[in-house]
Curated annotation (Swiss-Prot):
Signal peptide: none annotated. GO terms for biological process: mRNA pseudouridine synthesis; tRNA pseudouridine synthesis. InterPro entries: PsdUridine_synth_cat_dom_sf (IPR020103), PsdUridine_synth_N (IPR002501), tRNA_psdUridine_synth_TruB (IPR014780), TruB_C (IPR032819). It catalyses: uridine(55) in tRNA = pseudouridine(55) in tRNA. PANTHER family: PSEUDOURIDYLATE SYNTHASE TRUB1, TRNA-PSEUDOURIDINE SYNTHASE. It comes from Streptococcus pyogenes serotype M28 (strain MGAS6180). One of its GO terms (molecular function) is RNA binding. Responsible for synthesis of pseudouridine from uracil-55 in the psi GC loop of transfer RNAs. SUPFAM superfamilies: Pseudouridine synthase. Its EC number is 5.4.99.25. This is tRNA pseudouridine synthase B. The gene is truB.
Length: 294
C-alpha cells in the first residue's frame, strides 16, 4: 500500500473529485481523498491523502487557506465568478481610488458572516444549492461565520475602455470561506456590481503552489517509478500542535490508554522521534488516543 501526502496542483476545468479519480487509476490505490474542495474553475493547491494518510485528511481540511485572485468591478454574474451569466451592470463610482479600495478591504478582516452563493455545494433540506439554482428555485441560504486574516490588493487598479475596473488581491482565510462571495461583498461595499474573475489557491495546510505537482507531472514520474512527489504523512498534521512522547508513553498509546501531558490544546499530534504516531484528544485532564497511526 502507498501511504503519504501529495501536493497536487489542480488545473482549471477539473473537479476535486475528478482529480481523486484520476489519481486512483494512476497509483492503482483506492484509498485516496482530498483535503478541501476547489471549484472546477479554480486552480492551485489541492492536498491529497493516500493510504494511511487518509486518516489525517480531516486536519488538512480544517486548516486555513491562502488564495490569489482578481476582482472585476462593473458587473455581477449568476455564479459570482467569470463562468456565470451577467445579471446586473453598474457604472463605477465617481471616485474610485486605490486608497478607497484598500480601506474598504480592511473592513472585512476578522470574523465576518457570509451567505453562500446559490451555485455552491452547500446543502439545504438535503439538496445542494446549485441543484436549486439550476431549476430556478429560490431557497433561504444559511449564513456562516468565517475568519479573514489577510485581504489586500496586490496590483494597481486597471480601468478598461468598456467601463470596468480590475485588480488583483491576496486573501488568507479559514475553512469554508467563499472567496467569490468576498469579491461580491467588496463590490457592494464600494457601491458597484462585481464578481471574482480569477482565483488560485496558493497555499493550504502548509503546502504551497511552488512545490505542487500537476497530474501530468505525477504521471510522468510514476512511469519512471519515481515517487518523490509523495510526502510523509507528517505533512498531514502540520497545523496541529506537536507533542513529543517517550517510549513509555508510546506503549501506553499503543494500548489505547490515556496520558497526562503538559498541554491545554484540544488536539495534539503525538510524535515519537520524527514520526507521528497518534492524534490525541483532550478528555477532562488527560489525553485519549483518538487515532493511532502505528
Amino acid at each position: 500500500m502507498i501511504n503519504g501526502i501529495i501536493n497536487l496542483k489542480k488545473e482549471a476545468g477539473m473537479t476535486s473529485h475528478d482529480a481523486v479519480f484520476k489519481l486512483r487509476k494512476l497509483l492503482q490505490e483506492k484509498k485516496i481523498g482530498h483535503g478541501g474542495t476547489l471549484d472546477p474553475d479554480v486552480v492551485g493547491v489541492l492536498p491529497i491523502a493516500v493510504g494511511k494518510a487518509t486518516r489525517v485528511i480531516e486536519y488538512m481540511t480544517e486548516a486555513g487557506k491562502v488564495y490569489e485572485g482578481q476582482v472585476t468591478l462593473g458587473y455581477s454574474t449568476t455564479t459570482e465568478d467569470a463562468s456565470g451569466e451577467v445579471v446586473a451592470r453598474s457604472s463605477l463610482p465617481a471616485v474610485l481610488t486605490e486608497e478607497l479600495v484598500d480601506q474598504t478591504m480592511t473592513t472585512f478582516l476578522g470574523k465576518i458572516t457570509q451567505t453562500p452563493p446559490m451555485y455552491s455545494a452547500v446543502k439545504v433540506n438535503g439538496r445542494k444549492l446549485y441543484e436549486y439554482a439550476r431549476t430556478g428555485e429560490s431557497v433561504e441560504r444559511p449564513r456562516r461565520e468565517v475568519t479573514i486574516s489577510l485581504f489586500e490588493r496586490t496590483s494597481p487598479l486597471n480601468f478598461t475602455e468598456d467601463g470596468l475596473c480590475r485588480f488583483s488581491f491576496k486573501v488568507a482565510c479559514s475553512k469554508g470561506t467563499y472567496v467569490r462571495t468576498l469579491a461580491v461583498d467588496l463590490g457592494r461595499a464600494l457601491w458597484v456590481e462585481s464578481h471574482m474573475s480569477f482565483l488560485q489557491r496558493s497555499a493550504s495546510a502548509g503546502l504551497t503552489l511552488e512545490t505542487a505537482y500537476t497530474l501530468g507531472e505525477i504521471a510522468d514520474m510514476v512511469s519512471k517509478q519515481e515517487m518523490s512527489f509523495l510526502l510523509p504523512i507528517e505533512y498531514g498534521v502540520a497545523d496541529l500542535p506537536k507533542m513529543v512522547i517517550d517510549d513509555t508513553e508510546l506503549t501506553e498509546i499503543s494500548f489505547g490508554r490515556r496520558l497526562s501531558l503538559p498541554s491545554q490544546e484540544p488536539l495534539l499530534a503525538a510524535f515519537h522521534g520524527e514520526k507521528v504516531i497518534a492524534i490525541l484528544e483532550k478528555r477532562d485532564q488527560e489525553y485519549k488516543p483518538k487515532k493511532v497511526l502505528i
